[in-house]
């Protein structure tokens, strides 16, 4: 067959040669008669197999040129014949023959190659809303199901449509932005088998439908001459084809522009253009425009530069600089000011010498380019002596400026003196502002309101202070020798604020001659009166020397440097929800007594439940107590109600304040104070932790019994007086009480609580340290300072739970050797921080010092601190020189480290109680910590009605505001 084709081709060539030879004898052909060349074979398509020959002939009277196009690539041949001896798939394409007249004919050749069904050109680009051609033409037009398929079997988007052309490829219609990075294959069925082309990834160029987004870093700049000007312009668009530039109002400005571009996502192109003037000049001031445009349109944004030769400050008072305010009222002095560069120093000055800190300064706007500020001076409850000049001073690196307010305090007149002069004159001296007027009035008898005016003889005016802002003093006098009748003279001073009066009462009597007996009697009377006065003074002095009952716990209201301002406990509210009926209290034995009062064991019926009885401790005054002691006990009640409940303080349960003497009902702690508990347990102390011994089996909760025997045991509530002996209970039939875990819950029948006969070990001491630190952290969170933290002021109750207390009236400090006379007070000197001893400063940090002494007591099993050292001048000197106690016998090294940090001479270097809790928490066993955490969630008492408590405010040396309100309570 191939031989027959060659023979036919030979005849075709021969015919062509004959035409060429005879062409010269034929007439010329006009352009209108030109026809396209002829291609042999005369087909529009030709299918050959790979390896076969491709032979194409082009006939035309003139010269011809062959062009081969495949996958957008062109090849040319100037011969009339195009021959490919061994065809390949890449020879698939369109062959075009063009004559001299530009007319052409084409034939498309398919080179069928089973190994290469598709011709592929992998780069695939498409513009949004336009068509995109996937160049994967076929080499075999006879295959079926020619289409597109997603990679890895993934489906194509539902809205994707395409048109398949075996010669060109597959055209995706109306490309969308969502098609970006779409992976696909061309596919077809060949011989019943699906064939896939190489992978195509569609990259979509977004259609531009909006102008670029342009923004600058700041809308305006203010600079001093010589400073650098740098402004950043950010351009956002969907593609990088956006154009941008800076346009300067002053073309002479020398500026540099740096460009930085990047893509942030597929269709988010960003460009930064930073314009910089290294040293700005005044004539560089003006408008700078950042301009950007794309095919849709343009956008721009401007920034303004103002360059000044030097900085400035302009102050604008927001009120009249002359201010009148009444005595006791508040006034705010407000100024606004512009400053560039930023102000470095701002201050309010009183009378050009005294600084005041009751002011605040803040920017007028949060805008970065803001140069306007506001300063406010808050003057509260002004007194008459606080009038004067208040000056606001502000300065920056270049200039300073000020404005002065003249504040006048209007005060009600005050009668300073009213005297009878030797020359028969009555003189009245009054002071006030504005200038008071003094009028004189006369009335017969001893009336307190006179209406008959009397003209003054002499009136003098003087200023009561050096400055013109003080009270004005008026002297006025009248002659009373003209009055012939008994009566009253009123001196009445008044101004716009108010008035005040003083009265003179006088009577005219007959002259009486002295009697000879009168003088000795008068002398005797004067001597007796003098002696009585001396006796009264001595008794008063002794009374004042007597220690007064004072609430040790102090609640801090604010801190000014090293000065603590305490809340007056008498001003704290008392919620009558704490009231408990007196007739439901059944009093028992006295637990302890002091100079001012006593604590009595009692049974309260219906305190927790209506049908339940509970053993409580009731604090009350002695019948001989004075008013100050009664007020102090009420203050103690208010402080306890303010604090609220915590497991490690002696909590308030109720009170009786109506219908009789004040009674304060608190928790009853049956094991007494911790100091004597430690001393009792010295002989049975186990040096290692109890959990390491077999005795750990004894530590169990006993919840099946119905009554507590604690109240039946020997009373060891507290050491009220020296010399009281303590006897360890020895009932043979008592079971050993639970060490931890039998704490009373609100709705649970109380567990049996027996006298604690178990031994003491190191884990117990760590537990006591941890609990007391938790309790003190709670007090500190309520801004409460204890001032007398010691083992004697820690009580112990069921489950070896420690509770911090304030004995107050119930301790006989007069006979307690721990309290040393210092001035007219008795103080626990060995427990006090140096700043408390020498400067009478009590702070949260001084409580931390006392806690360190408490730890020493604890790990020495109740020894007295600074053993063998009397409190004398030598003791004070050693404390000043930094003497500290050595580690107690049973203290681990970590606990002694805590003691030493608590005894740091610098209060600010001492840890807080919260930090101490965290340090000790690392040393106690996990079981103890877990049990304590469970107990802390129990609330054994009725709800505390007090609300809105406070967290600890800043302590000594705090950098925060010097005066802070009480904040919302945070849990400890």
Curated annotation (Swiss-Prot):
Function summary: Tyrosine-protein kinase that acts as a cell-surface receptor for the cytokine KITLG/SCF and plays an essential role in the regulation of cell survival and proliferation, hematopoiesis, stem cell maintenance, gametogenesis, mast cell development, migration and function, and in melanogenesis. In response to KITLG/SCF binding, KIT can activate several signaling pathways. Phosphorylates PIK3R1, PLCG1, SH2B2/APS and CBL. Activates the AKT1 signaling pathway by phosphorylation of PIK3R1, the regulatory subunit of phosphatidylinositol 3-kinase.
Name of one Pfam family that matches: ig
Domain Ig-like C2-type: start-end pairs: 27-112, 121-205, 212-308, 317-410, 413-507
Note: Numerous proteins are phosphorylated in response to KIT signaling, but it is not evident to determine which are directly phosphorylated by KIT under in vivo conditions.
This protein's name: Mast/stem cell growth factor receptor Kit
Taxonomy, superkingdom: Eukaryota
Membrane-traversing stretches: 521-541
Disulfide bond positions: 58-97, 136-186, 151-183, 233-290, 428-491
Gene from which this protein is expressed: KIT
Phosphotyrosine PTM positions: 543, 549, 564, 566, 699, 717, 726, 819, 896, 932
Binding site for ATP: 592-599, 619, 667-673, 792
Binding site for Mg(2+): 564, 793, 806
Topological domains annotated Extracellular: 26-520
Similarity comment text for this entry: Belongs to the protein kinase superfamily. Tyr protein kinase family. CSF-1/PDGF receptor subfamily.
List of residues that carry Phosphoserine: 737, 742, 817, 887, 955
GO cellular component: plasma membrane; receptor complex
EC number(s) recorded for this UniProt protein: 2.7.10.1
Assembly and binders: Monomer in the absence of bound KITLG/SCF. Homodimer in the presence of bound KITLG/SCF, forming a heterotetramer with two KITLG/SCF molecules. Interacts (via phosphorylated tyrosine residues) with the adapter proteins GRB2 and GRB7 (via SH2 domain), and SH2B2/APS. Interacts (via C-terminus) with MPDZ (via the tenth PDZ domain). Interacts (via phosphorylated tyrosine residues) with PIK3R1 and PIK3 catalytic subunit. Interacts (via phosphorylated tyrosine) with CRK (isoform Crk-II), FYN, SHC1 and MATK/CHK (via SH2 domain). Interacts with LYN and FES/FPS.
């Amino acid at each position: 067959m191939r031989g027959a084709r060659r023979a036919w081709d030979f005849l075709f060539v021969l015919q062509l040669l004959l035409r060429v030879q005879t062409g010269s004898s034929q007439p010329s052909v006009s352009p209108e008669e030109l026809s396209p060349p002829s291609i042999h074979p005369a087909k529009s398509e030709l299918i050959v197999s790979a390896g076969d020959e491709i032979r194409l002939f082009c006939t035309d009277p003139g010269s011809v040129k062959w062009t081969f196009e495949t996958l957008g690539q062109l090849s040319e041949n100037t011969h009339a014949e195009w021959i490919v001896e061994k065809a390949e798939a890449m020879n698939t394409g369109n062959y075009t023959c063009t004559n001299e007249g530009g007319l052409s004919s084409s034939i498309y050749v398919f080179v069928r190659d089973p190994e290469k069904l598709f011709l592929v050109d992998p780069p695939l680009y498409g513009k949004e809303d336009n068509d995109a051609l996937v160049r994967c033409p076929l080499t075999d037009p006879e295959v079926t199901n020619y289409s597109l398929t997603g990679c890895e079997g993934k489906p194509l988007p539902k809205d994707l449509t395409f048109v398949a052309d075996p010669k060109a490829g597959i055209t995706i219609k109306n490309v969308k932005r969502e098609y970006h990075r779409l992976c696909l294959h061309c596919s077809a069925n060949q011989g019943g088998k699906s064939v896939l082309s190489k992978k195509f990834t569609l990259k979509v160029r977004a259609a531009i439908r909006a102008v670029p987004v342009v923004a600058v870093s700041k809308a305006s700049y203010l600079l001093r001459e010589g400073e650098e000007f740098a402004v950043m312009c950010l351009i956002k668009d969907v593609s990088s084809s956006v154009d941008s530039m800076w346009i300067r109002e002053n073309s002479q400005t020398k500026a540099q522009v740096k460009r930085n571009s990047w893509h942030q996502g597929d269709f988010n192109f960003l460009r930064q253009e930073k314009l910089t003037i290294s040293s700005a000049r005044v004539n560089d001031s003006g408008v700078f425009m950042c301009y950007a445009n794309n095919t849709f349109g343009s956008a721009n944004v401007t920034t303004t530069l103002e360059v000044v030769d030097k900085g400035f400050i302009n102050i604008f008072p927001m009120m009249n600089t002359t201010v009148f305010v009444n005595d006791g009222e508040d006034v705010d002095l407000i100024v606004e000011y512009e400053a560039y560069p930023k102000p470095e120093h701002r201050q309010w000055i009183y009378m050009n010498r005294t600084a005041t800190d009751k002011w605040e300064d803040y920017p007028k706007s949060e805008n970065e380019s803001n140069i306007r500020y506001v300063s406010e001076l808050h003057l509260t409850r002004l007194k008459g002596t606080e009038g004067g000049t208040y000056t606001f001073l502000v300065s920056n690196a270049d200039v300073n400026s000020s404005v002065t307010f003249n504040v006048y305090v209007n005060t009600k007149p005050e009668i300073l003196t009213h005297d009878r002069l030797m020359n028969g004159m009555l003189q009245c001296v009054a002071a006030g502002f504005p200038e008071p007027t003094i009028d004189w009035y006369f009335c017969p008898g001893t009336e307190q309101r006179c209406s008959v005016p009397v003209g003054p003889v002499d009136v003098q005016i003087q200023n009561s202070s050096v400055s013109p802002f003080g009270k004005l003093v008026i002297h006025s006098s009248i002659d009373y020798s003209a009055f012939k009748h008994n009566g009253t003279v009123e001196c009445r001073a008044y101004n716009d604020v108010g008035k005040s009066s003083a009265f003179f009462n006088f009577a005219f009597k007959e002259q009486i001659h002295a009697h000879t007996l009168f003088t000795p009697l008068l002398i005797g009377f004067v001597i007796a009166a003098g002696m009585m006065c001396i006796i009264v003074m001595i008794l008063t002095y002794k009374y004042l020397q007597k220690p007064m009952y004072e609430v040790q716990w102090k609640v801090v209201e604010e801190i000014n440097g090293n000065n603590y301002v305490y809340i007056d406990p008498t001003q704290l509210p008392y919620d009558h929800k704490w009231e408990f009926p007196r007739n439901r209290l059944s009093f028992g034995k006295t637990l302890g007594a002091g100079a001012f009062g006593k604590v009595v064991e009692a049974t309260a019926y219906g305190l927790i439940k209506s049908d339940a009885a509970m053993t409580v401790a009731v604090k009350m005054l002695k019948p001989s107590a004075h008013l100050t002691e009664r007020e102090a006990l009420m203050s103690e009640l208010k402080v306890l109600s303010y604090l609220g409940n915590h497991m490690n303080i002696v909590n308030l349960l109720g009170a009786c304040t109506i219908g009789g003497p004040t009674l304060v009902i608190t928790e009853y702690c049956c094991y007494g104070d911790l100091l004597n508990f430690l001393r009792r347990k010295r002989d049975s102390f186990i040096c290692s932790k109890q959990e390491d011994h077999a005795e750990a089996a004894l530590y169990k909760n006993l919840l099946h019994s119905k009554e507590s025997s604690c109240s039946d045991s020997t009373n060891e509530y507290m050491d009220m007086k020296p010399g009281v002996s303590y006897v360890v209970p020895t009932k043979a039939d008592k079971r050993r009480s639970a060490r931890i875990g039998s704490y009373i819950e609100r709705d649970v029948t109380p567990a049996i609580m027996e006298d604690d006969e178990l031994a003491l070990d190191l884990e117990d001491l760590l537990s006591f340290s941890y609990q007391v630190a938790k309790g003190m952290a709670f007090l500190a969170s309520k801004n409460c300072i204890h001032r007398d933290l010691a083992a004697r002021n820690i009580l112990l109750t069921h489950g070896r739970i420690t509770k911090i207390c304030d004995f107050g009236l119930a301790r006989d400090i007069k006979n307690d050797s721990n309290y040393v006379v210092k001035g007219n007070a008795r103080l626990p000197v060995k427990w006090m921080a140096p700043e408390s001893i020498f400067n009478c400063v009590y702070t949260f940090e001084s409580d931390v010092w006392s806690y360190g002494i408490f730890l020493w007591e604890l790990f020495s099993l109740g020894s007295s601190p600074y053993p063998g050292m009397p409190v004398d001048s030598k003791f004070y000197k050693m404390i000043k020189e930094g003497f500290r106690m050595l580690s107690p016998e049973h203290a681990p090294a970590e606990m002694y480290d805590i003691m030493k940090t608590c005894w740091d001479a610098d209060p600010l270097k001492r840890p807080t109680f919260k930090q101490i809790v965290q340090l000790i928490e690392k040393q106690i066993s996990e079981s103890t910590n877990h049990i304590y955490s469970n107990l802390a969630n129990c609330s054994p008492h009725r709800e505390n009605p007090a609300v809105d408590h406070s967290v600890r405010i800043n302590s000594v040396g705090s950098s925060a505001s010097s005066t802070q309100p009480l904040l919302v309570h945070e849990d400890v």
